[in-house]
Amino acid sequence: MSNGAFDAIFEYAWGQIDKPISGDFIYGKDLPKLIEIIENIFQKAQKSGSYELRLPLFSEINKDLFRTFSNTKTFFKIHKEEFDDIFFNLVNHPLREILENAFIGVDSIPSDFIVSMNLNSPSKFLVENKSKNTEGAGISTSRKKLTESPIKLLSRNNIGKALEVQVEELKRELTAKQSLLQENERQVSELKIRLETYQEKYASIQQRFSDLQKARQVEDNQNSSRTSDPGSPLVTGIDQKAILEEFRRRLQRQTDTISFLKDQIRRERGLNCSNDKVSHSKRKHATTDGDGTFKNFISAVPSNIWVKATIRIIVCFALLAGVLPYIRKYVYAHDTPSQNSRLQLSWWENSGILSKIVWFFEDQTDLETEYRSNANVDDAYSRVFGI
């Protein structure tokens, strides 16, 4: 293994960034640029075809670590003596090992590699730096040991650990996102399968619904044709049963109503039955002789004349009622009633005209009373039969 070849490559890349005015350090923001210069040297060697190399030298994760360090430690001073430790803390491998493993079939960097890439003629700055480093090697080493504090060493370790933690977190996030993506893909596939199943079910249900609609339409058409036929047994049976049932129901209701009204009329008229018989016998006995004459008289006289005559008769009757008692004393003073007579008549019942007038007014009074008593019954009967 040639330490001189590695030192030449490193010094060449370092000299591209480190300026004479800045001393022997670079800033943290220059670390990705330093790595890029080293990688360009090997890419150029591969293009020339002189060597078989494993490229790229650094993985994308390592490059992300370099960029993270440059962003978080922008103005952090990286001294040349501290570079190996910082680099090892970042990628867990020394830079020398990475460069040596890049060559296929060779365990170390070939010595002619430096000559082929023109890396053995260092710049003026490199010569000056080497002379300074050679002259003051002992002084700088002793000074470094004296000035390097435990806090600085601790900060180096903390930087490496922080970067490792960040790398682990990024790996975990990547794994979680990949798992989530796989789960989403699985759910999408399941949803597609369910959607296809529902579409098939919907198509079958729609087909069944259309078949049921067609069957119902056919059934409705058959029922309508049967109903429209007046001679069909179904229509005839329904009509006859409905008509007969309704007729019987109404007839029974009317029969019950008529029977109730008859019973009520009989009860109301039965109270005056005996009085009607007595009055009828009296009227029949007294008015037998003048019955025909009075009927002819009533039919011959107009209604207006009859009203006037009635009023005059009432007045005359009132006068006669006051005079006749005195006349009766003298006319019937010596008459004694017959012992065989079964019915004793009043004095006015012996006269055909007077008895007819009295019985007429009594009949009118009885009819009015009976009409008033049966008014409610007649109204109910009229409402029932719609008269």
From Swiss-Prot:
Region of interest called Disordered, as start-end residue ranges on this chain: 216-235
Protein's UniProt keywords contain Nucleus: yes
Swiss-Prot/TrEMBL keywords: Coiled coil, Cytoplasm, Cytoskeleton, Membrane, Nucleus, Transmembrane, Transmembrane helix
Major place of residence: nucleus
Membrane topology: Single-pass membrane protein
Coiled coil ranges: 157-269
Family assignment from sequence similarity: Belongs to the MPS2 family.
Name of this chain's protein: Monopolar spindle protein 2
Organism phylogeny: Eukaryota, Fungi, Dikarya, Ascomycota, Saccharomycotina
Gene encoding the protein: MPS2
